[in-house]
């Protein structure tokens, strides 16, 4: 049995425990006054409605959308997203793709405004192909390439609108790609590798405004794998860092320059295919189960080329193979299973602070069990954070 909080359609919003009868019992004793108040609300100018809604946490939007069609249009508009961004009211929402040993992958999302923290299942989105590259820009999530079966690599691209959990196809990439590296820099998405290494078409760039692809001519690094397969990637300091079996590579689109580190470099000391990584404040974070620096969370300082521990808190013994970390609005989020509780997924939220000497300290703000499968062993394919 899977225990979670599911998104339901209908007047009860996203709370399955809501009782419609309770709403009727608690209605205003003066229905005429209620009707008048609603009529006045519906007569507000659209711009005023937009500014009012912009100040309200997004967790209440399913309820607000029931007021009228005009309110629903405002909630799903690009203009509201821009207004919230200008006012500094954007909120992070974390998406996770979770499956188990015998059940298919499903999308879930987590809002920081929900207490206690809960995962919400999304049934309207397609799963992500094995080996697909995923990049987020604002409230959109771009899923590119992957494989169908063992050797049928694809160039397919879809975009997910996380405001209303809809999706559609975008123009295909010019080449099929499997386990490519990708990242957004300057509003454009660069996709690297995922196919046989050759200078002419190893890099493609997607213009999100015109929704078009262009091939970027680039001299491939000599020591990169010939098949162009990458195990993981991040964006840091305006560069796309990608890891393959031979080492780490960084591509800077502005100059079209490559930089490489071997498998024995300091950067790859903790960066390996089994680990999950995220970038917060231009620093690279990961989990180190060996605690070789005295702590399970370590951070890489690219300007100094050094790893240091994140201090100030204790964690349960994590399972590295089943742990994923993400940047959740500047906080470090860990989705993990722990030794002895492999059928549970915990969500640990850590607030970070840079102290004197440049050391990072953390405080655990939340440690919640957000998923349980009593029958199967759950696993987390990916975690991505969008902001809107």
From Swiss-Prot:
UniProt-listed Gene3D superfamilies: Kelch-type beta propeller
UniProt superkingdom: Eukaryota
* Region described as Disordered: 6-33
* Kelch repeat residues: 140-187, 189-233
Q: Where is the composition biased (Low complexity)?
A: 9-21
Composition bias of kind Acidic residues appears in: 22-33
Q: Does the keyword Repeat apply?
A: yes
What positions does the domain F-box occupy?
38-84
Provide this UniProt record's keywords sorted from A to Z: Kelch repeat, Repeat
Which parts of the chain are coiled coil? none
PROSITE patterns membership: FBOX
Q: Does the keyword Repeat apply?
A: yes
User: What InterPro entries does this protein's entry cite?
Assistant: F-box-like_dom_sf, F-box/kelch-repeat_ARATH, F-box_dom, Kelch-typ_b-propeller, Kelch_1
**Name of the protein this chain belongs to:** Putative F-box/kelch-repeat protein At2g29820
């Amino acid at each position: 049995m899977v225990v979670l909080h599911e998104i339901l359609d209908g007047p009860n919003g996203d709370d399955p425990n809501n009782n419609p009868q309770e709403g009727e019992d608690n209605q205003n004793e003066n229905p005429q006054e209620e009707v008048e108040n609603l009529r006045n609300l519906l007569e507000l100018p659209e711009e005023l409605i937009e500014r009012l809604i912009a100040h309200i946490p997004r967790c209440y939007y399913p309820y607000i959308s029931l007021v009228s069609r005009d309110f629903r249009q405002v909630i799903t508009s690009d203009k509201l997203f821009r207004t919230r961004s200008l006012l500094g009211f954007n909120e992070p929402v974390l998406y996770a793709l979770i499956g188990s040993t015998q059940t298919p992958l499903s999308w879930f999302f987590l809002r920081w405004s929900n207490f206690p923290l809960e995962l919400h299942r999304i049934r309207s989105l397609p799963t992500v192909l094995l080996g697909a590259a995923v990049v987020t820009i604002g409230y959109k999530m771009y899923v590119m390439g992957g494989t169908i079966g063992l050797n049928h690599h694809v160039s397919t691209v879809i975009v997910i609108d996380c405001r209303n959990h809809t999706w559609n196809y975008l123009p295909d990439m010019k080449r099929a790609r499997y386990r490519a590296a990708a990242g957004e820099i300057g509003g454009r998405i660069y996709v690297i590798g995922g196919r046989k290494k050759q200078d002419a078409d190893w890099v493609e760039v997607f213009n999100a405004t015109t929704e078009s692809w262009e091939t970027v001519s680039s001299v491939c690094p000599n020591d990169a794998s010939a098949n162009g397969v990458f195990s993981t990637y991040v964006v840091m300091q305006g560069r796309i860092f990608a890891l393959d079996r031979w080492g780490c590579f960084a591509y800077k689109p502005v100059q079209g320059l490559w930089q490489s580190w071997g498998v024995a470099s300091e950067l790859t000391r903790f960066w390996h295919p089994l680990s999950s990584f995220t970038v917060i404040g231009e620093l690279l974070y990961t989990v180190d189960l060996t605690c070789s620096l005295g702590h399970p969370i370590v951070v890489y300082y690219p300007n100094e080329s050094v790893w240091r521990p994140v201090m100030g808190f204790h964690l349960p013994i994590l399972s590295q193979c089943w742990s994923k970390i993400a940047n959740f609005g500047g906080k470090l989020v860990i989705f993990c299973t722990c030794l002895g509780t492999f059928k549970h997924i915990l969500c640990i939220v850590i607030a970070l602070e840079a102290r004197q000497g440049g050391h990072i300290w953390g405080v655990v703000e939340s440690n919640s069990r957000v998923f349980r499968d009593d029958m199967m062993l759950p696993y987390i394919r990916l975690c991505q954070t969008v902001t809107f």
